[in-house]
């Protein structure tokens, strides 16, 4: 099963990639929502970890586009700018988790396990 990570922050994206790889998962990373949407990886993704606040399309915009195009994999939303309205919108649109940066890696592991079991 493949996990995609979308985050415009190189340091965060690379750290998450190393962490998820250390758990034994296949990982692809993208610096923007647009890059992910235009990739062939989209059809092989089982779980998406996406930042919510990015230039161009936000993580919420990405989630909306994925739903509109029939992609139904599990989404874990992360943000450095936690906001209750944004959390509610992400969860109502189908995200299985909303994590504020910095987040506890044990929580991420739990959400990844949940996402991949449901995939």
Regions found by a protein language model. Name each.
Residues 61, 82-97:
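Alpha4 helix (beta4-alpha4-beta5 surface) of REC/receiver domains from two-component response regulators
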Residues 51, 79:
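Active-site residues of response regulator receiver
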Residues 38, 60-72:
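Short amphipathic alpha-helix used as the core "switch/output" element in two-component signaling
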Residues 29-47:
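Acidic, metal-coordinating helix/loop segments flanking the phosphotransfer/catalytic sites
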Residues 85, 103-113:
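C-terminal output helix
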Residues 10-28:
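Two-component/phosphorelay signaling modules centered on CheY-like receiver
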Residues 54:
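Receiver (REC) domain active-site loop signature in two-component systems and cognate sites
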Residues 31-32, 58-61:
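Acidic catalytic/metal-coordinating carboxylates
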